[in-house]
Amino acid sequence: MVTNRSHLSHHLPVIVLCISIFILLLIVIILSLLPPIATDALVHHLAIPKLWLLNGGFYEIKWSVFSYYPMNVDLLYLIPLYFHNDIIPNFIHMGFGIGTSWLIFRYLSNKLNRVAGLLGVLVFFSTPIVLRMSTVAYVDLGLVFFTTASILAYLHWRNEEYKKNKWLVLSAIAMGLALGTKYNALIAWLFLTLAIIFFYSRDTEKQWPAIKYGAIFFLVSL
């Protein structure tokens, strides 16, 4: 009996966190089943791909400034819209939020423990703006996912003492996808490029290689 109680108390934080995350996810799924009513979804993220489908291909929509914005995530909405489904885009956008949660969980679990990983997921997913964004066909969670992936890939490269350059390339590719999702990624792109140069130079005391790797990240991201 004592052993069972000890076992339960040991796993209680994990159980509570998992239940909390499940409840939040269930609420988001239910809300995502509603038809799109968000303004940006109706005039931009779903409207532009729908116009492309009606035209039979890409074309310049001069009357809509939104058509000149980055469209990486919006292009994914073409598939369900082709089948006249405007609900699936909500779940596609939600998927980026879940993907970001997974990245947070993996990072914190490896750095600390599973409880910290689940707590990180709960804090992220319970943030009001994340909950709201998870129920609409926007692109912001795609931006968050790609930016987070880029930063974590860079940290992995740095933790490996800059020996596995594939992580730098993966970081640059992820940042490039973020840039193709929303212009806000330009800020993260600039700061991460400078961070690569600064920390590599400080950690290795080599300036020219630092500039070289910063340039590689900068150019591959484009």
What function would you assign to each model-found segment?
Residues 1-28, 212-218:
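Start-transfer (signal-anchor) and selected internal transmembrane alpha helices
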Residues 150-167, 202:
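Membrane-interface transmembrane helices that cradle and orient dolichyl/undecaprenyl
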Residues 132-142:
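Short acidic/glycine- and proline-prone juxtamembrane loop motifs at membrane-interface regions
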